[in-house]
Structures are given as structure tokens and as C-alpha cells.
């Protein structure tokens, strides 16, 4: 039995009201994505998605998380920060060359791809993280990471494709349904969003599922259903300010 740590940055990041998601509904409060970790195990070959293994020998960045970029990529990142339009293309090409050389040295190891891409997520560089996650199309944690970064960048159709791929790889990894539901919500595909979020709630009973589903129902004009879901969530999460705000705002808009 292999003990692993799941990086909850990716998992928590998929909750609805963050980053590039459109805030057109009644939710004024955002849930913050924090980089925390929890321990689990992978028996019987099941991949949980978003897995990572801490390396205590890795140096930490000034931001307090582990540094997985080789020195050449760190240098290129710094150069690109102040680069003009004339040189940015050349620097990007150099970066891609060095990135591929680095990953080839480790035979495109899926864990190494995840460590590196996840670091760019922590640096809020979703475009770079996405390109690195896409280097691996076989490990669910990287497929899920690609889906989530697509969603954060507002590329919801691409996100849906990748979340669907992750679901086909492991239907029991509930966060893929949440992510796909939110991407569908962003595209106003409300019926599909409801279906995905109901599956997510049935699998996890998680707070963010109730928030997202109530918000979708409200956007559909189904105030009664929205209030019912928010109330169910409040019965389970009595201290939730966002669910209470949702319920109050739905009630003010009248329940048909």
C-alpha cells in the first residue's frame, strides 16, 4: 500500500466562486482556495486525482511552498517578467525547449509534471500550469489539473472535455463532477450543471456542492429549488455564511 498526500489546492480550487468564474448570480461572497493537504492511500490501483508526494529535501520558495522548477526555468520566468513584446516570444520558445529537455530527462514522469504544474498554480500562472499539465494525458491528476486550469482561464469548453476525460478514467473521483458542473454553469448549460452537481453532492455531501447547486438553480429562476438546496446545506453546515447569504437573498427574491 502506497501512502500519498493529496494536494487539495487543485481540489479546493474547483469550487465555484473563484478565479475566472463569472459572478452573475446572487453570491457576493467567495470561497478562498488554500493549499492544504490530507493523507490517503491508493489501494487496488485506484487513482484519486491531484495526488502529490512531499519531498522534505526540496527547497522552499519565499512564498513558503516547495520549489520544483530547475534553475534555468526560474531564470527564464524572471526574465519574462520584465521582457518587452519583442523578446517575449523568443523567451517563451527557450522556455519550452528547456522544459521539454527537463521532462525528457525524467521520461515525462507524471508526478514530476504534477509537482511542476501545481507550483505554477500556486504562483497563479494558470496558463503555464495548463501547458505543463497537458504534457501528460494518462494520469488523472494531470488531466484534472488541465481541466481546472482551463476553467480558471475561462476556456470552459476545453475544461468540460478534460473533466469528462477524468470522469471516464475514474468515475469515483467526485471533484471532476464539481469542476464540470461549474464549467457548464459558466456556459449557461444549466441542466448539465445541475446533473453534475447533484452527482457531486450525492458522492460527497460537501459544502461547495450545495453552494454551487443553489446558485445554479437561482440563475435558472428556480427559486424554490434554490432555497431548498441552500436550506439542506445549512442544516448540515450551520455556520456557513455563504449558504446563509444565499438562502436570505433567494428568500428576498420570493420563492415561487
What are the functions of these language-model segments?
Residues 111, 141, 145, 175, ...:
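Start-of-helix register in tetratricopeptide repeats
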Residues 122, 152-153, 186-187, 219-220, ...:
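Register position in tetratricopeptide repeats
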Residues 17-111:
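N-terminal leader/linker segments that initiate helical-solenoid repeat arrays
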Residues 107, 137, 171, 204-205, ...:
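Short coil turns that delineate tetratricopeptide repeat
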Residues 115, 145, 179-182, 212, ...:
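Canonical tetratricopeptide repeat
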